[in-house]
Amino acid sequence: MFIFLLILFVCILLLPSCARADESPAAHQRRSLQSLHDAFSSAANSQYAYSIAHRLATDLHLHNNATYGGRQAGSDAEHAAADYLADEMRRIGLSDVEKAAAKCDKWQFNGASFTVNGTEYPVYTYATASTVPEGITAPIVYVGRGTMYDYEGVDVKGKIVLVDIDQRADWWITYPMLEAEHQGAAAILAANVGGFGQIADDALNSQDICGPTSIPTCSIGVRASREIRAQLPHGTVLGTLKVDNTVEIGKGTTYNVTGRIRGKSSEFQILLGGHYDTHFWGFQDDCCAVGLVLAAAKAMLDIGFEPENDIVFCLHGAEEWGSSYTQFDWTVGAWEMINTLHPEWVGKTLAFLNFELPAYEFATYTTTYSAPEMFSLLRDFTTRYPYTPKPQGCFPDGVLTEGYQTYTYSDDFSYYAAGVPSTVNGFLLQKDMEHVHPFYIDYYHTQYDTPDTYNDAVMAFNLRYYGALAIYIDQMPALQLDFTAQYTRLKDALDADIFAQSGADAALYRSVVESLLPPAQALKARIDTLNARYLAADEAGDIAEMTRLRQAGRPLIRKVLNAFRYCQKYLLGLMYERPIVPHQAPQETIALCQHIIDCLVRHDPATAVDQYVATVNNCLESYSIYFSPAVIDTLNDMNWGAGNQDNLYFGTNINFDKAEVEEASRSVYQRRAEIGGDFAKEIRVYRDAIDMEKKKLRADVHKETEAIGWLKDLLG
């Protein structure tokens, strides 16, 4: 009897530990993929996401100006928001919460006004100069679109110029601003007559400036501009412009706010992010993204999710603007994060899932932009994985998966260029990847980006869909990067005729590219097979097999991350803002210059101007056509000046080399109506440019051919 009681007593003592074992993290390893996804979808709370976004967009303590908002890089409001977000991360239970300090230029919009004949008109600034406290009182002069031709016969020295601008069809505010400064104006006000801010005639707009601080530069509503212009024919009209705008070069600090859910292993990680700096109130752009990221974190924590890898949640500062005197002045916080603060994240990060404006229904469908190597992953996750959420109450045509190349307009590109596989929800371009969604013409970067634009069904879907994508990437034993997409990209970049004209070895290039396909296909097959077997083991509840497959997948993960980093280092170029294979820049320029020459030889400058001249150097020759050489000198120095090469951010080492055709572009445009003119001088400029571009093409192709050969070995 004593022995029986002793055994019973020992069993009773052991019972609590047995119960704890069932509730321990080890228990979560036995949760099936279906139950994991079901639990996350149930816990994903779009209303929590909305509450975060709403506070960020409406709390005046988190904005620099009580009337129009604004939370610019390095500003007091951005710092206050960083504190709030770090506190919220701690409150919901994330670990290792940190405000990672990064360098930026500081911009803080405190306020501005423009008064004409006793009427005060609202204005909003760019990251440009302030006025003295008492303001600038000066005559107002209307100069059309603000090109150098609009100033002919007009004296604007010391005056305030008023221009119309369409920053989509024509040019960025930078160029009329620099032209106004060059012409001696004291300040410039721009009315958005097209392109942006079309939601209302009192809409104001702000953008990154892609230039120096220059002169005071403000957006003014179209209605206000019309009222002021109506007074000008009746005599001199004085205006008083007051701008309280802090722009401090090299003196700013932005914070990237991070927290994490620690995985069973910290060798690799998955990153979810958005940015919290804003123009105006920025509810969609990008307060909603911050809400989504924190809601995903909270849902994972609430279900006790123990990932295989670390899940890092990173809210970036200084996305909208972060540096003066550079073409690449946006996504500065993210660039600093991956290149300066955490370069070790390259080769460690399985994916960066970035978010922009995730609570607005842009179209009847949605997409994901990504690195080409991720097209297959996204397609399989969306169309073949059994646990992927489907849109409900939004996007009736579903998620399109044809593959959409990530662009330069969001933080994910900084990570992508550094070598991190990256995505962003389809927020900007329509499926043709050429035209923007109407939201960008109407609401984007205006005071009308408010909670009134919120769509809960879209937020709920994006939260569930991308949260499930993060779980999918975490749970699969092998990272599904597909280098057959890189093969296709490289193959499609070949123009055999231009290669032949340039003396580049098209046959060798084609041969090396074709040699890339078999190892890329074989690697893809290995990854797909491993992941398929893992899914089968999960369905069968075979934990031992799942563990074995995970171990087998680790070397494959290291291999594909190494190859991905290599691809971006040697095979990614940038033509102004457009991702390319490096040789495509000279290849394209040669073709365009030859078309122009053909037109000029047959005395047809009008066709040359209408179809070709402005498109050389991506679009930069359109600026050469319309703005003074001094303005273009500033543009050239920002991009290619020897003293500014450490100020290029995501354009560092991948920006294209411009063809020197500026004088010819301007001359052909100015002579476009001539019939039978002699264009020998201009033809010579374009021919010299072709000769130089042929040299660049041969050099690029040589480097690429060598790099592709090494890539083939990395994949084998």
Explain the meaning of each model-derived region.
Residues 464-465, 473-716:
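C-terminal non-catalytic alpha-helical accessory regions
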Residues 47, 54, 58-160:
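Noncatalytic luminal/extracellular "stalk/propeptide" segments of secretory-pathway proteins
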